Amino acid sequence: YQPAGLYNALLAPLAGYTVKGAVWYQGESSIDRRDYAQMLKALIMKWREDFGDKRLPFIVVQLPNFMKDSEEWPVESQWAWRRDEQRLAVQQTKHTALTVALDLGEWNDIHPLNKKDLAQRVAACAEYLAYGNKKAPLSPVPDKVYRRGKAVVITFRHAGEGLLTKDGSEPLHFAVSDHKGI
């Protein structure tokens, strides 16, 4: 394993060429890195430098759900931490979009079978970022979290008329934690 091996072999030779944008679908091998958001932001900046475009559209595919029946609370999951790090990197970096794939995961396979819906979501982000279609639907992302009495209220950007589950009903539960996992 060579950390820069793939970059040097596959991406570096393309530096200087013109590209319309980039899609990043992270592998699962370095799931436990707590500094992932900083690393991802550095990667985006490096690619933009290499391709000579400070506004290069960059789409990040968020890790899907995996192993539905888990002993861990969602906020304790390494995958939940990674998804949040992906969200933070996109939130803190201009000209980026997050493609949510949480609902496309499989309980028994790390790679989701439903590639069509994922591709449509990535394409919508590309339409929005790279081609200026401001009506293209983007993935919902949490915007604000606050307490109202005994309830916790979460507002989302890009949620249209609201969030729905696969069966068309409203979601009943969310797992929420602070940056310390509490």
Q: Where do the PLM segments sit?
A:
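Cell-envelope and extracellular/periplasmic
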Residues: 1-182
